[in-house]
């Protein structure tokens, strides 16, 4: 799994988790059907994840990526968590059961519409943070840069 060391700037592609030191920038390229999760630490650093609807070989599945972010964050204090991207493409349950994990013939939940509140709760629960720290923003396709 791609967990990279803390650096000044980092590019996180689908299924990757990484960290930047205070003042660093997280770059999430080609966010289309994905969501990005950025944990802003009290010391100014950031832990980020580029969550993909479908697993990229060798990278984190959607139902494992929050655990990787939580492990990376550790006991450090969290100021805020930002979830951005294709909000309408994601059911909150994808963070607990990835699309790939459904058996043939098993019904995969399909979102009827955007559920920012459900996504915020799912991310807060997955990271062990309070719901009040999590914001969700639907963004058009493209690269995301978090300074």
Language model region names:
Residues 1-147:
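Active-site microenvironment for binding and transforming phosphate-containing groups
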């Amino acid at each position: 799994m791609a967990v990279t060391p803390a650096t000044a700037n980092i590019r996180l592609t689908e299924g990757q988790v990484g960290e930047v030191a205070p003042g660093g920038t997280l770059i999430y390229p080609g966010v289309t059907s994905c969501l990005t999760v950025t944990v802003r630490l009290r010391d100014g650093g950031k832990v980020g994840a580029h969550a993909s609807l479908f697993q990229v070989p060798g990278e984190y599945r959607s139902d494992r990526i929050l655990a990787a972010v939580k492990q990376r964050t550790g006991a450090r204090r969290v100021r805020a968590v930002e979830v951005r991207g294709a909000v309408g493409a994601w059911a909150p349950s994808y963070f607990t059961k990835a699309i790939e994990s459904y058996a043939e013939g098993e019904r995969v939940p399909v979102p009827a519409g955007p559920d920012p509140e459900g996504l915020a709760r799912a991310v807060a629960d997955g990271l062990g943070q309070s719901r009040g720290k999590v914001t969700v923003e639907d963004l058009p396709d493209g690269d995301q840069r978090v300074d």
